[in-house]
Amino acid sequence: MTEATLTPPAVPRLTSLSHGGGCGCKIAPGVLSELLKRATPPALFPDLLVGTETSDDAAVYRLNDEQAIVATTDFFMPIVDDPFDFGRIAATNALSDVYAMGGKPILALALVGMPINVLPHETIAAILRGGESVCAEAGIPVAGGHSIDSVEPIYGLAAIGVVHPSRVKRNAAARAGDVLVLGKPLGVGVLSAALKKNQLDAAGYAQMVATTTKLNRPGAELAALPGVHALTDVTGFGLLGHTLELARGANLTARVHYASLPWLAGVEAFVADGVFTGASGRNWAAYGTDVRLADGLPPVAQALLTDPQTSGGLLVACAPEAVDDVLACFRADGFDRAAVIGEMVDGPSRVDVA
């Protein structure tokens, strides 16, 4: 842990105050889709380059021919018990959506909901400091925010970034023949479930915090590469869910090579022991009909592939000739587990895993 926990022993664990943690507490994708269908369709705005059409990572609004604004918000309940780490993870996760659009963050606003009569002010202050530390690392200020007294602890950011209109990377622009590259290892949801069950050791906790607090800064550089066609980040809907968004947006089939997927240490063993989040099942129920799992995959495959990631890695669809540059971009920023995991091919809008 990077800062001593400030809560006294009598104070409840942060994770005990929430019914779900991190991106695992997202509304299930099927329910969210149904809710959005019932919403009033937005008016047409010619300068709104990216809205809700393809469930992309952030909204993008063109100011002029040289500049567009990237706007997003993300918040959730605690995924860890250390308040400083919770703040860091939530802030890193929120900024990721700006990077996933190819943008550069310029400022953030804090979104804070806390059970004021349950948590000491020192604990809440540590959460805020954690978020501020990540924003400082990203080179941006926390310029304000909003707070409420809530039943469960909630923290996150509204993040604003900038991007050149020609460099906006949507999740619906993959092409047949593109190679899929993933920036971070998978399994955060499994580790969070193990933590909540008191089964995660210090080494497991350290790797969980390390991956969830690593900023997806390569996004802006990746957007500048001519061979990069589509970009998103893997979060609450799991690898399958976000890969399926690429496939649906491009009307293609995404082929994922299970043996090539990078995993955080220990997650396969945890799942084999029945330790994973309820969100995995909800994710599969929402989109499993559009996924084909090959015979011979390990029994843990479905739970791992649907595992909700908090502050997960960037998922890139790029031309084959751009793969080396994409991997070099990741490696230069310390993403040493970045890996080629599949490709986009002609076919129905689905994900095939073999």
Swiss-Prot record:
One Pfam family named in its UniProt record: AIRS_C
Catalytic activity: hydrogenselenide + ATP + H2O = selenophosphate + AMP + phosphate + 2 H(+)
Residues annotated to bind ATP: 26, 54-56, 74, 97, 145-147
Protein EC: 2.7.9.3
GO function terms (MF aspect): ATP binding; magnesium ion binding; selenide, water dikinase activity
Binding-site list for Mg(2+): 57, 97, 233
NCBIfam families (UniProt xref): PRK00943.1, selD
Protein name per the record: Selenide, water dikinase
Organism this protein belongs to: Burkholderia ambifaria (strain MC40-6)
